[in-house]
């Protein structure tokens, strides 16, 4: 006769287990006999034990069994991961980074606890607290492969320069101080315009011409120093000690840039001979927001990170090492903090650039507008100066609004001024100096305006966002924005309209706005899973996906894959290594959106395809590392950790789609040919059918009705493990400073 073990998931989840011998925590620590006494029936009387009664101590028992610790912890971690990952609205670029940071933080803590559980109990309690695994083999390795670093540090070839240009640079103070030679200075400028300026819309190619270097040095000192500073980080000079000189030159140039910015802010310049307060300085500040100095990752030389006027005890400081949380604090210092400093620095630089633009009359008309170009009248035509002014107007609009959207701040650009910039038309006669640039900026400005409208409509407040998700009004709003996105794409996203670098840039920006907009459907699915789930069940699958929400999720998945595939292409041609910071922010955000969408559920073929895209992105980031402290190397490490976990934890689940009667229910259009083609659902397990490059181009999305139960993969979801509640003041934890770092946690 077959004897079946009673299910642990039956009607008695809180069953009490009896042990032959029990000891309180105090007796176990001392390895002493725990005498509870016996009653008339021979059973133990219960706490307190004789020893605790005699010493007047609390007599506490641990109800958990030692062999069960790791398993229960893993189950809870999985539930915490799924719920927090899928419920969290990624409404700014910082939210995605915080997800990555907290997940790595959780892995370090979990690895530490697992190793602690594997040690003998005596070792754990010898010092009164569990032993941590600081420095163990479970720590995530952030080092860059030596071959990648060797490629990044490969010396460049010096430029061929005429004697006249060399004599011009010989008068430069940096050359006279011996930091580098005149020919090396020209090499830095040439390589910046060759490898980096083409990836950013800030500068024209006016200063790329050697004949104009004299004007760059004499009339745009801030811009000149900024170009040299940025280029010196990305390019290593040939000769003995090239790498060491690279660090020295870059650091000295950054120090000089800081001095110039200080003079700008505090007005430390003769008004009769202005060299700092000009349009070139505005362009320099924009470049610094695109490419950061290496010093961003290190504390200031004078006082370190401590700016307090009082001495604080080491244990009370934010990063004081208390043992158990050292891994979390290490991740905060290495990953989250540099990214936040990047946003903070860019925000202040752009604010200074906007203030200087107002001072110079960049947005004025008439005589006031001439103040910005008095210094350039000797060597620039009027049309060139007017074009440079209009470029600055548009660049400031896009850069400020994009960063404000990313970090969740109110834009520094006044509403009236924004409308004025958007309504101004560039003169037809100026197009000869940069028609493709003007087309690119027009498209980017329209897309920025559209993204800002999406944010204002969906996320004016957390309470309002939740109300829209629960009432189904978000569908009407998406029906309003989706045609606008399609119209923008049809008008602007054409390869023949842009240079290749500009097209790649606007391609990534478009698909990110597309992902950002359709992610509202993902959040609606999670809210219904929370509302409809049975709290008594151990696992609640988030399968109450309406067809219209399934369509939105497919848009998110496809948009993310489009971004990451483009990133892989940039890596193949060597452009990713020189890309601005905003590209790496888009990579991080897109990867998080993709993993969130996949966790809700996906077909095996789409899941395999998406995870392969993530793997290629990881390889692209690693193979194009700038140095061992660039954020791309850390992004790659974190992404690899979570992609491998998603592969293990996305399990096959039976489809139990709940047909809702609310107005949110809508049927997607599925051609009969597609339904018949997907009748054999076991085929994707063996082969990968060709997937269209852009599903939205096909005019339909695969229907949920055509997906067999064994072809649907999703992440286990436990709504009872929600890390926050709707009643918590109406604010998402992602906006609460330290509460930003709470998100998902996959077990090892």
Swiss-Prot record:
<dbReference type="GO" id="GO:0008270">
    <property type="term" value="F:zinc ion binding"/>
</dbReference>
<dbReference type="GO" id="GO:0003677">
    <property type="term" value="F:DNA binding"/>
</dbReference>
<dbReference type="InterPro" id="IPR036864">
    <property type="entry name" value="Zn2-C6_fun-type_DNA-bd_sf"/>
</dbReference>
<keyword id="KW-0539">Nucleus</keyword>
<dbReference type="Pfam" id="PF00172">
    <property type="entry name" value="Zn_clus"/>
</dbReference>
<protein>
    <recommendedName>
        <fullName>Transcription factor hmgR</fullName>
    </recommendedName>
</protein>
<feature type="region of interest" description="Disordered">
    <location>
        <begin position="661"/>
        <end position="683"/>
    </location>
</feature>
<feature type="region of interest" description="Disordered">
    <location>
        <begin position="108"/>
        <end position="142"/>
    </location>
</feature>
<dbReference type="GO" id="GO:0005634">
    <property type="term" value="C:nucleus"/>
</dbReference>
<dbReference type="InterPro" id="IPR001138">
    <property type="entry name" value="Zn2Cys6_DnaBD"/>
</dbReference>
<dbReference type="GO" id="GO:0000981">
    <property type="term" value="F:DNA-binding transcription factor activity, RNA polymerase II-specific"/>
</dbReference>
<dbReference type="GO" id="GO:0045944">
    <property type="term" value="P:positive regulation of transcription by RNA polymerase II"/>
</dbReference>
<keyword id="KW-0804">Transcription</keyword>
<comment type="function">
    <text>Transcription factor; part of the L-tyrosine degradation gene cluster that mediates the biosynthesis of the brownish pigment pyomelanin as an alternative melanin. Acts as a transcriptional activator for the genes of the tyrosine degradation cluster.</text>
</comment>
<dbReference type="InterPro" id="IPR052780">
    <property type="entry name" value="AAA_Catabolism_Regulators"/>
</dbReference>
<dbReference type="GO" id="GO:0009074">
    <property type="term" value="P:aromatic amino acid family catabolic process"/>
</dbReference>
<feature type="DNA-binding region" description="Zn(2)-C6 fungal-type">
    <location>
        <begin position="24"/>
        <end position="59"/>
    </location>
</feature>
<keyword id="KW-0238">DNA-binding</keyword>
<keyword id="KW-0805">Transcription regulation</keyword>
């Amino acid at each position: 006769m077959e004897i079946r073990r009673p299910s642990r998931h039956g009607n008695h989840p809180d069953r009490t287990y009896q042990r032959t011998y029990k000891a309180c925590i105090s007796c176990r620590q001392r390895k002493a006999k725990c005498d509870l006494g016996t009653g008339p029936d021979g059973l133990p009387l219960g706490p307190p034990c004789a020893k605790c009664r005699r010493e007047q101590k609390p007599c506490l028992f641990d109800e958990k069994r030692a062999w069960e610790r790791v398993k229960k912890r893993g189950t809870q971690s999985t539930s915490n991961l799924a719920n927090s990952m899928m419920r969290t609205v990624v409404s700014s670029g910082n939210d995605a980074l915080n997800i990555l940071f907290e997940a790595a933080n959780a892995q370090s803590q979990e690895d530490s606890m697992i190793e602690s559980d594997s040690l003998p109990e005596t070792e754990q309690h010898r010092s009164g607290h569990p032993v941590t695994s600081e420095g163990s083999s479970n720590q995530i390795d952030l080092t860059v492969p030596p071959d990648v670093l060797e490629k990044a540090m490969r010396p460049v070839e010096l430029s061929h320069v005429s004697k006249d240009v060399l004599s011009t640079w010989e008068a430069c103070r940096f050359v006279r101080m011996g930091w580098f030679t005149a020919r090396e200075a020209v090499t830095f400028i040439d390589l910046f315009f060759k490898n980096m300026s083409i990836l950013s819309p800030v500068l024209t190619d006016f200063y790329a011409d050697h004949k104009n270097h004299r004007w760059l040095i004499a009339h745009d000192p801030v811009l000149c120093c900024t170009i040299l500073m940025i280029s010196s980080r990305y390019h290593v000079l040939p000769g003995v000690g090239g790498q060491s000189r690279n660090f020295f030159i870059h650091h000295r140039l950054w120090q000089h840039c800081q001095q110039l910015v200080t003079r700008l802010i505090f007005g430390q310049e003769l008004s009769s001979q202005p060299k700092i307060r000009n349009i070139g300085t505005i362009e320099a500040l924009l470049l610094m927001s695109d490419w950061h100095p290496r010093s961003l990752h290190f504390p200031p030389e004078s006082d370190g990170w401590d700016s307090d006027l009082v001495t604080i005890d080491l244990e009370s400081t934010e990063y004081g090492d208390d043992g158990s949380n050292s891994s979390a604090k290490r991740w905060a210092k290495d990953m989250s903090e540099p990214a936040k400093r990047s946003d903070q620095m860019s925000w202040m630089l752009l604010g200074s650039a906007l203030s200087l633009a107002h001072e110079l009359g960049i947005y004025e008309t008439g005589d006031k507008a001439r103040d910005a170009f008095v210094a350039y009248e000797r060597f620039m035509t009027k049309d060139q100066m007017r074009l440079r002014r209009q470029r600055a107007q548009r660049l400031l609009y896009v850069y400020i609004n994009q960063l404000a959207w990313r970090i969740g701040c109110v834009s520094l650009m006044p509403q009236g001024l924004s409308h004025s910039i958007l309504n101004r038309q560039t003169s037809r006669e100026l197009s000869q100096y940069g028609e493709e640039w003007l087309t690119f900026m027009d498209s980017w400005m329209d897309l920025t305006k559209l993204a800002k409208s999406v944010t204002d409509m969906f996320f004016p407040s957390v309470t309002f966002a939740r109300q829209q998700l629960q009432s189904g009004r978000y569908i009407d709003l998406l029906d309003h924005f989706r045609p606008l996105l399609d119209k923008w794409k049809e008008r602007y996203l054409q390869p023949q309209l842009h240079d290749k670098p500009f097209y790649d840039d606007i391609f990534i920006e478009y698909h990110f706005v597309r992902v950002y907009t359709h992610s509202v459907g993902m959040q609606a699915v999670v809210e219904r899973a929370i509302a409809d789930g049975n709290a008594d069940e151990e696992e609640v699958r988030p399968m109450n996906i309406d067809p219209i929400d399934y369509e939105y999720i497919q848009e998110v998945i496809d948009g993310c894959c489009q971004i990451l595939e483009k990133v892989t292409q940039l890596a193949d041609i060597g452009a990713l290594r020189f890309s601005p910071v905003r590209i790496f922010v888009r990579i991080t955000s897109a990867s998080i959106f993709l993993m969130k969408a996949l966790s809700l559920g996906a077909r095996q073929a789409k899941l395999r395809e998406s995870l392969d895209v993530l793997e290629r992105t990881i390889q692209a980031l690693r193979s194009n590392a700038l140095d061992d402290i660039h954020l791309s190397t850390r992004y790659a490490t974190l992404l690899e950790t979570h992609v491998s976990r998603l592969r293990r934890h996305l399990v096959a689940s039976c489809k139990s789609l709940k047909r809702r009667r609310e107005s949110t229910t809508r049927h997607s259009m599925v051609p009969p040919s597609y339904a018949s083609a997907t009748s054999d659902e076991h085929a994707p397990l063996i082969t990968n059918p060709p997937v269209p490059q852009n599903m939205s181009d096909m005019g339909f999305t695969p229907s949920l009705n055509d997906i067999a139960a064994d072809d649907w993969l999703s992440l286990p979801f436990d709504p009872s493990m929600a890390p926050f509640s709707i009643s918590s003041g109406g604010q998402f934890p992602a906006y609460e400073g330290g509460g930003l770092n709470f998100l998902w946690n996959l077990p090892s």
